[in-house]
Amino acid sequence: AVEAARNCLKNSTEVPTSVTLGSTTFPFADRSNSGVVADALNLPLQTQTEDVFGSRRAGTSALVRHFRGSSSTLLLASDCRETRPGSTQEMQYGHGAASLLLGTGDTLADIISVESVHEDLIDQYRTVETKYDYALEERWVREEGWLKIVPETIKSALNKANLEIGHVDKFIVHGTASAARSLLKKLGADSKKLADSLQSNIGDCGCAHPLLMLTNTLAKATTGQHFMVVGFGQGSDVILLKTNDKIAQSKFYQSVDIHLNNKRVVDNYALYLSLRNHIDIDFGLRSERDNRTALSAYYRKRREISAMLGGRCAKCNTLQFPRSLLCVSCGTDEPQEEESLSGLIGRVKSFTEVRYEFGKSKPKAGKR
């Protein structure tokens, strides 16, 4: 989520006044997860934070709720769902995050209509006491859910916008390929208008997936196109958007394609299972450590740790991390101005190689 947010805010002069983070796999049940993200982004302490969870529609539902909002909101959706080794879900699921900056002014696209319907049709679920999702039969979900609940939601959203189904240029549907094709067939729309589902490359990324598909579609959009985003899970969300003339001037930093081109392949299944903590491998004495964080010390140094805040010398302009009482370059004791080093590229001046240091998945050297 932090990585997606940094890509979204890169070269942006607008500072969000609120952060909304949606997920079905939050690491903390009693701690503000969006607050952790806000700290990592070095946002002001007055930034309003909110966690949205409990449904794969968490991302689209948050987008619906912020419709007509006047404040600048950083909307994030991130999921990292666990799967049972050897299961179908292990081959289908992916881990990912997406970020959108919502507000007024210089926008790339305008939300022209939204509709949301709650219907407790359980296509899959996971309780607080279980680790893996339990999914029901796909055909039943398609016929009772996708072909009965979603069409009415879509028609309502189109009526609000005074549009016909033929006006939609791309359908961004988070669902199986058969469900998406069957839905468009029932609506009388061309299945060629389905946006790239991305599932063949990155898998199904849970509540982040519809927003991932949206950002990927926007990166290739032209002026005046109509997009329809469909979220599904115990109901449905439909968002209609129209791109404006700013879309042609936009730059999408770190798009989905760029990340796919920079991927690292893990072709050792045992290593993969170890990275996902599905098997407990003995890594030796060097892997033993205290797993508890010294929270009082972390609180004192949280800005340096989370946002990687360093200091810039007021006298010689040297950027250094961490900040110190004396400048490492000129030795002055003048106050240093806070500056984040996150995202910067530096050169390694010297290093010590420790071949026996523990690491589950050590970084590999290579060209950037």
Regions inferred by a protein language model and the residue ranges of each:
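Conserved active-site "lid/cap" helical segment
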Residues: 1-18, 29, 85, 121-169, ...
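Condensing-enzyme catalytic core mediating Claisen C-C bond formation in acyl metabolism
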Residues: 1-2, 87-144, 148, 222, ...
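Structural signature of cysteine-dependent C-C bond-forming condensing enzymes
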Residues: 11-17, 43-48, 70-74, 151, ...
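Acidic, glycine-rich active-site loops and adjacent beta-strand->loop/helix elements
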Residues: 22-28, 54-58, 77-83, 105, ...
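Conserved catalytic cysteine-centered active-site region
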Residues: 24-72, 182-213
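Flexible, glycine-rich active-site loops centered on histidine and acidic residues
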Residues: 65, 71-99
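Cys/His-rich short segments
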Residues: 287-347
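Long, charge-rich boundary regions
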Residues: 338-368
